[in-house]
Amino acid sequence: MSGLTLGRGPGGVRPTQTATFTTHHPSADADRSSNNLPPTSSQLSDDFSFGSPLSPADSQAHDGLLQDSLFPEWGSGAPRPGIDSPDEMQRQDPLATQIWKLYSRTKAQLPNQERMENLTWRMMAMSLKRKERERAQQSMFPARRGSAGPSGIAQLRISDPPVATGNPQSTDLTADPMNLDDFIVPFESPSDHPSPSAVKISDSTASAAIPIKSRKDQLRDSTPVPASFHHPAQDQRKNSEFGYVPRRVRKTSIDERQFFSLQVPTRKRPAESSPQVPPVSNSMLAHDPDLASGVPDYALDAPSSAFGFHQGNHHPVNHHNHTSPGAPFGLDTFGLGDDPILPSAGPYQSQFTFSPSESPMASGHPFANLYSHTPVASSLNSTDFFSPPPSGYQSTASTPQPTYDGDHSVYFDMPSGDARTQRRIPNYISHRSNLSASLQPRYMFNQNNHEQASSSTVHSPSYPIPQPQHVDPTQVLNATNYSTGNSHHTGAMFSFGADSDNEDDDGHQLSERAGLAMPTEYGDEDGFSSGMQWDGQFPGSFHSLPGFGPQHRKHVTIGSTDMMDTPEEWNHGGSLGRTHGSVASVSEVRNREQDPRRQKIARTTSTPNTAQLLRQSMHSNNNTSHTSPNTPPESALSSAVPSRPASPGGSKNGDQGSNGPTTCTNCFTQTTPLWRRNPEGQPLCNACGLFLKLHGVVRPLSLKTDVIKKRNRSSANSLAVGTSRASKKTARKNSVQQASVTTPTSSRAQNGTSFESPPAGFSAAAGRSNGVVPIAAAPPKAAPSAAASPSTGQTRNPIQAAPKRQRRLEKATEMETDEANKSAGGRSKVVPLAPAMPPAAANPANHSIAGGQGASQEWEWLTMSL
């Protein structure tokens, strides 16, 4: 047969075919064409059922032309081993057969029909040959794969240079003009189909190319990746020939797995030097493919090796290299504290590390060291941490970033309340220490957070808690599951000023979601009294910061009262939980529903939990909490931002109030149903405070009466309707005011019905120590004791029941109280400046009844304006 179609003759279509098709025999060709004459195209077509239109004469003519004139070597006609038959070719390489069919059908129209046919055969032969080579190589592949064999790149390199050389191993291979095999680039992946010579050379000289470790070898070398790691999937990729190609842009051609395998040097930069942003940082992940691949993993290792384990556990060497794979990408693994990227990341700047309490890393002592050394203070100090310290917590509305914990903490810490507890304040405090003073004092949760603080302080190093950095949704969401349940409060603590209104209810959930460890860190179980003696310490430190108190209202400052022991049931939720303890207290106490926005304002510690305050006053152990009640003069603070239930925690003034009669800094009256604070935290009487809050200007004394009248209307309306903004403000205030007024009015009316109302009202009054909310006149003289005792017993229970419930009860009670107050207390709420005095007198008794702290209680009533 002429070499045209079957490649016979010295210059056969594919000299290499023989190598590939060693089984092909001339006899097979003879079968196809007796006499070994080149089959005509028609014959080929018939044999192949291609239905070639060419006639034998045409085919022969073309064959003769090509053989004699162009390719005399074909004239030999010596049958060369070739493809056995199209059928076999079909079986061996259907694709090649299809291509051959394509050309066989179109060759009639092609300028060089015979030549094209030859090329077609060559292509098919190449494909078949390639398959044969592959099979031959596959036999070697297991060994090659086991051994460091050239990776895809190396193979390509190996195959490329020798391509031009003839394959000596192919017996028929000669430098034939038509030996296209060596010159034709496989139409398929070159790596998949290296040229025959290249393949053979690569087989013999696999090491000739730059040896690239096989993926398997690297994987073997690499330390086992934690199950949490996602890289194993990458390893699968890497096993493939192109595994060396990174899913993302690889920093180096070297397998990125080395980085994960602790072969940090292979990484672009060592983990130590590289700013391992906490895996949670999405932007970081986007920037760092390695981290991106590892991020989900880092925390999922239950050890949260990133958290505590890195510390002592997996790779002490990488102890600070939080990237140590041994601690599978825990936060520590990434060296969050050290990570320069974190600071660059934004609000977490300055190695914000995490929200102090919530951040699994920052909270736990294991990380206390980690993050303490981290100059958290630098960034967190005043501005980076959520917001300037004066904003108490960050202005949560503007800087929700405490939810960094939401990013991490929630995922990391939420796994267990204990974890959160463990990672709790201690480290954070150390960071806080770096933070502005206000932040520090604020977190002066007595480290005694009972066991909470201690556990958070002490346990973190090992963080037995898996603290999966990635959310354990149940962990994150079920703050109640945590003994601390602080996540609830945490949410409140870090409620966003703007959003906090609705967060009162959502606060704990939010915190849970956020995984804020704050409440936990505050020691919810222990109640506010146990862990977070925020109020006493915090109000002073918190509000002591100039402008910190009044301003922080908006910023959902953590009020000391909030830390007050909320009902233990809420405690688990975390006293911080606005919905639960402190947060719920003020906002809830207020007509939270009436003023959803304010209601949302998370009364974090900043907002005294009236119930908590009352309760604490009852317990009288939370003196600091009382501080917040005492702080109430500071409550004027909340008048600074009337729109916000802006009562920060207890105020300095509150302390003054407890120490002596509070004097309105505006009208100098010492008699007022409710003490408020101006933005500076100076005590204002209810009238002045309300005026300031409503109008944003100091109440002109000349307008005092008018203002009071106006305010009274709005208060009554707000209480009833809570429609207008002022009304809403009033309503919020009224929640407390109602409490105070309600205590008189409600205590009469509510003693029977308002079991909840007095708690709501009273709790609101007590909890509002920081709030500007115009607490209605303190309980009437007669009513105070009645109200106080119901409040004492009932308020405490309602508080325990739940500030949120109080809020609702309060709302219902407010409606009742509204009517009662409108009739009786409506004026006294606003106007009660005068009535307040008798209540004030009664208030001490009331308060002492409730809290056993007369002056403190009195101030609590005054402070209820929060």
UniProtKB/Swiss-Prot annotation:
* Segments of this protein annotated with the region Disordered: 1-89, 188-245, 260-287, 382-404, 562-663, 711-763, 775-854
Alphabetical UniProt keywords: Activator, DNA-binding, Metal-binding, Nitrate assimilation, Nucleus, Transcription, Transcription regulation, Zinc, Zinc-finger
Q: Where is the composition biased (Polar residues)?
A: 15-25, 33-46, 273-284, 392-402, 602-618, 714-725, 733-756
Q: Where is there biased composition of kind Gly residues? A: 1-12
The organism's place on the tree of life at top rank: Eukaryota
* Record field: compositional bias (Low complexity): 619-629, 776-791
Instruction: Return the CDD domains for the record.
Output: ZnF_GATA
Spell out the SUPFAM superfamilies in the cross-references.
Glucocorticoid receptor-like (DNA-binding domain) (SSF57716)
- Basic and acidic residues composition-biased segments: 589-598
GO MF terms here are: DNA-binding transcription factor activity, RNA polymerase II-specific; RNA polymerase II cis-regulatory region sequence-specific DNA binding; zinc ion binding
The cross-references to Pfam families, in alphabetical order and at most eight, read: AreA_N (PF07573), GATA (PF00320), GATA_AreA (PF08550)
Q: Tell me, which GO biological process terms does this entry list?
A: negative regulation of transcription by RNA polymerase II; nitrate assimilation; positive regulation of transcription by RNA polymerase II
Annotated GATA-type zinc fingers sit at: 664-688
Output the Gene Ontology cellular-component terms. Answer: nucleus
Where found in the cell?
Nucleus
Q: What does this protein do?
A: Major nitrogen regulatory protein. Positively acting regulatory gene of nitrogen metabolite repression.
Q: What is this protein called?
A: Nitrogen regulatory protein areA
Q: What is the lineage of its organism?
A: Eukaryota, Fungi, Dikarya, Ascomycota, Pezizomycotina
Which gene name belongs to this protein?
areA
